[in-house]
């Protein structure tokens, strides 16, 4: 099952973790240097909930919490 919100279409986004080493210039050092860049994913907070449909029925969907808080979905 794809990690995509059925309402907003939110999906995982690529990003990275940047590790740095050294003392900052502000603290009297010669500056920080990048030692490692690791790829990672930012995943949306998806919940599998029962949603009320406009025709009166219900359906289970993967919905992001952002959509729930915004009131875009009515829980059954």
Curated annotation (Swiss-Prot):
GO biological process, alphabetically ordered: translation
Gene Ontology cellular component terms for the protein in this record: ribonucleoprotein complex; ribosome
GO molecular function, one term: structural constituent of ribosome
Pfam families given in the database record: Ribosomal_L28 (PF00830)
Keyword entries, A-Z: Ribonucleoprotein, Ribosomal protein
Similarity field: Belongs to the bacterial ribosomal protein bL28 family.
Protein name according to UniProt: Large ribosomal subunit protein bL28
């Amino acid at each position: 099952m794809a990690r995509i919100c059925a309402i907003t279409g939110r999906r995982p986004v690529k990003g990275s973790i940047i590790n740095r080493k050294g003392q900052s210039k502000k603290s009297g050092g010669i500056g920080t240097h990048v030692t490692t860049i690791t790829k990672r994913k930012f995943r949306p907070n998806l919940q599998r909930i029962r949603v009320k449909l406009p025709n009166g029925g219900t359906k289970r969907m993967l919905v992001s919490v952002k959509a729930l808080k915004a009131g875009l979905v009515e829980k059954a």
